C-alpha cells in the first residue's frame, strides 16, 4: 500500500511539471535564533511552522513530533523522544529540549518519567528540530538531536488577538489571546487555554490550564528587552501500560484494580494503609520566567542574553504520593561579530558564547523497615534522592564565506559538575563528579548554482551520565559517583539541497559512532543483592538517510518525507574487565532495539478556493526488533509496522473567522505506541477521532 501511495505522488508530480511553483526550502527560512541561522546552511534543520501544526487535530507536541519520520515518540519508553534511532536506553539522554531557547530537558528519568507536552499546540509558533549534533551550541546530550520550541511569547512584536473553541471525541479546548500596544515602545501579550483531554481508557483524562504573559520593551532601534512568564497546571489520571492479553479482552473498558498503599505508622509501629485508585497520577505543574536582552552596539555586532528560570513537579505513577520536583535556572550569552566587510570573505562572522546554568531534581518518600516480623511492626525509613548538575561552557563558532563556499569551524569547552545526595533503603552517599569535555565542529558547503547546495560536516560531541547512571557505583554502605566515562560520539553528515524544476529536494545521509557507550550491567553484591553498574563496554554505530520533497502544482501542494535508520551495537573490547563470559550478549544485527528501519509521511493539500482547503496525511512506521540479544529473537520477535491516515478541512473567512475540522486515524487502525518485553505490556494509541473548531482573530 505504501509503495502505491508513494508512486501516485511521484507520478502526479511529473504529470503536472508545467504547473511548477517551487516552495522555499527550510534552509532559507530565517530562525528566531542567531545560532540556528548559522548552523542551518551546513546542517539538516527540520522546521515546522504554525500553519503546519495548528488546526490539524494534533493533541500535543508528542503527536506533532511523531509525524516526523526520523523521530519516534514513545516507542523506546513512556514519554521518550527518539531522534535518529538512539533506541531503548539511549534516547532519553541523547536529547536536548528547549522552549524559547531555554533548556527544559529532564535531568533524571528514574523511577518517575514525564513527557515534554508542556506548551499547548495553540501556543506554538514554530518547532525547529536539529537531528543529530548541535553540540557546539548545546553541549551534552545532542547525539540524538535538539528540539527548540518557539512560543507566541518569543515574537512579542507581533501581537495576537484571538478566541478559539474546539471540540471532539477526545475532549474540548477553549483559548483566548489578547495583545495590546501600551505605548510606542511597550507591548503586552496575554493568553489563557483550558484543555480537557479524554484519554484512551475508561475514566482517564488530562485536564490542564495554561497561562502566559509577555512584556516587550523596545528601548531604541538598537536595544530590546522582553519578559515572558508561563504556567501550566495539569490534573488527571491514566493507564501507563497494560497487559496485552488483558487489553485484547477488555479494550477501552479496562479499569485498573485499586491498590493498597502504606501512608504511615500508628503509635505501636503498625502500618496505616489506604486503598487508592490503580490509575497513574497525571498531576503536573510547570512554571517558567524568561528575560531576553538584545543589543546592537554597532552595525556589525550583536549581543544577546537569555536568562531563564523554571520549576515544576510531576508524578505519572500509581505508587502513591511519589512526586519528582525539578528546577532549572541560568543564562546564555551570545556575541556575534560580522567581519571581512568589502572583501572576498564578506558575510563571514564569529559567534562567541558563554553558558552558565544549573538543574536540580529531588524525590523524597518514606520506606518502612521491618522491626519485628511476627508482630508486624515497622519503623519509618525516609528515602531521599537529590540530584544537581551545574554546566559552564565557552564556545566559538566561526562562519567563513568565500565566493560560493561556506565553512563553519566550532569549538566548545564544557565544565560539568554532576552532584547527588542520595539515601536509599540500604546505603547512602553524596558526591560531585567533575566532568570536562571539548566539542569540535567542521563543515563545508558549496552553492553550485542559484538553487543547489551540497555540504559535508563533522562533529565531535559527548553525552554525560543521566541521573540514574551517575550513582551507579555502590557498596554495602556507600553510594559513589560512577567511574564510567562520558560517551564520545563522532558524527559525519553529507547533504544536498536543490530545486528540481517542479520540486524542492532536501537529502541528508549520516553516520555516527560511539566507541565508549555506557552500559548498566547487573552485578551481585553480597549484601545488597542484584544491582547495576555503569561501565563503558559498548560501541555503537548508527547510519541513516533523511529525505524531504515538496511540490506546488497549481492548487495542489504535496509533501513527502522519508527516513531510513539502522544501528549496530557490540562490545568494544573492555567487556572482559567487567562481565563474565557466560553473560555475554550475542548482539543482534537486525537494528537497535525499538528503532523502525523505515518511516514515511505523505501529505497532500488541495486549495479548492482561496479560502477553503483540505489535507490528507499518510504516516507509515516500519517494523522493528524488540530484542538486542539474538537468543531472545524467537521470544521477543519483531513488532509489526502500521500506517495511519488523517484528514482535515479548513475554511478562512475574510472577517477573521476560521472554521476547521477533521478525522485522525481515519480507518480506525489498532496499533501500539509502546510494546514491552515479550509484548507483555503495551500502550495503545488512539483509534479514530473526530474534531472541529472555530477561531476568531480580532
Regions found by a protein language model. Name each.
Residues 166-196, 201-240, 281-298, 335-337, ...:
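Transmembrane beta-barrel wall of Gram-negative outer-membrane proteins
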Residues 401-405, 416, 510-514, 533-630, ...:
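Gram-negative outer-membrane beta-barrel transporters
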Residues 62-103:
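Extracytoplasmic beta-strand/coil segments of soluble accessory domains associated
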Residues 258-288, 292-293, 382-390, 433-435, ...:
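Outer-membrane beta-barrel signature, preferentially recognizing the C-terminal barrel domain
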Residues 179, 445, 456, 492-494, ...:
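Conserved C-terminal beta-signal and adjacent last beta-strands/turns
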Residues 103-131:
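Short acidic/polar hinge/loop motifs at secondary-structure boundaries
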Residues 358-374, 415-422, 445-493, 504-505, ...:
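Surface-exposed extracellular loop regions of Gram-negative outer-membrane beta-barrel proteins
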Residues 197, 224-290, 312-326:
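Flexible loop and strand-edge segments within Gram-negative outer membrane beta-barrel domains
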